[in-house]
Amino acid sequence: MTFLSRSRFLALFLSGLTLLSVGTAVHAQAPAAPTDKPLKVGVSAGPYGDVLREAARLSEKQGIKAEIIEFTDWNQPNAALQAGDIDLNNFQNRPYLANQVKTRGYQIVALDESLLVPAGIYSRKYTRAADIPAGAKIAIPNDPTNGGRALLLFQKAGLIQLKPGTGLYASVLDVAENPKKLQIVEIDAAQLPRSLDDVAAAFVSSNYAYLAGLDLNTALVAETAVEEAKPYFTLVFAAREDRKDDPRIRKFIEVYRSQPVKDFTLAKFKGSILPAW
């Protein structure tokens, strides 16, 4: 290779390196997601998505297009949020989120409240809790948090008495008094509506009650906004810590927490699911 050829080769090689470094720098500075892409909002399958879709319909009129993505597994919405596959989710309460952050190391924070989703004790056989006979079966969720909620509500109904100080963390072992010797059966929460054919009464959360056609107004007893369990039936929006102040996220939540969406929620769910604002 002549001196001239070597010089031309070196010049071309250096030019290539320059272009490569420029291209890499441009790529590194590219935005993660263009603002013209829809805001992806995760939710558990069921009625909560109906409210989000109404908010999305209204937010599009204000320039914020949102895509509502439903998950059937409750572990997925936070995992997808942490991974950046969605921008926001709305399916959980603060205690559930706090536990997920603690156990899984998620960098996710709670934002504004969205819905109140009180549970009730339902029966297909009795119209009053007092009519439930001795030895009958009553059903509660088999997960610790909601199991405690259920036991508190059965205590409110006058059917059992819990040990002092157990509250939301109570288990079946914390039942201090059971004068009717009721059999307390622990069942997967999603199966509780179906259990009503086989038990005297069951604790059913609002999403499963709605899907099963149960009306909270017909419950033997229901949670109210002054209950100790309120944090457990108040849903919140959640976002990644580094995007909690994202203008599009804040705008969507503002639209969600508006009077038109409140009116929609009250009209559609007739008290079974309530706006939290």
Over which residues does each language-model region extend?
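Short helix-initiation/N-cap motifs at beta->coil->alpha
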Residues: 68-79, 166-194
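Beta->alpha turn/N-cap motifs
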Residues: 70-74, 84, 89-98, 115, ...
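Immediate post-signal peptide segment of exported/extracytoplasmic ligand-binding proteins
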Residues: 26-40, 59-60, 129-135
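A conserved helix-loop-strand patch within extracytoplasmic ligand-binding domains
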Residues: 111-161
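Ligand-binding "clamshell"
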Residues: 99-111, 126, 198, 203, ...
